[in-house]
Amino acid sequence: MFYYLNGTITLLDANLAVVDCGGVGYACHTTNYTLARLQLGKSAKLFTYCNIKEDAFDIFGFSTREELNCFERLLGVTGVGPKAALAILSVVSPEQLTLAVMTQDDKTITMAQGVGKKLAQRIILELKDKLLSLIHI
């Protein structure tokens, strides 16, 4: 859809940032890590993922491409939707997620709300060969 939004941050809330781009406010669901980097009234660039469903159009925004790439890889795991992927990246950085996957540390992944042991183990199994190339640790 669109790769990023570049504009002024007009609202910050729990896992939500609104970016004003040319007079249009785009609500972006985001992680705690991205929220910590944003400031009200300041310019920001968020890399985006658009989730279009029959009854909704959701935008997910990330401060780095690495975070966006990890989000997209998580969505490729059976049983992981946008909310679970966002929850995971709200408690671990892309680097921490990669380390958890490489060391088969399912406890780190289960720190995310709504992610149990079985799903964490599936994430490890399905992402073991895919995550290392996405980030620089």
Walk through the language-model features, giving the residues of each.
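Anionic-ligand binding region
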Residues: 104-115, 122-126
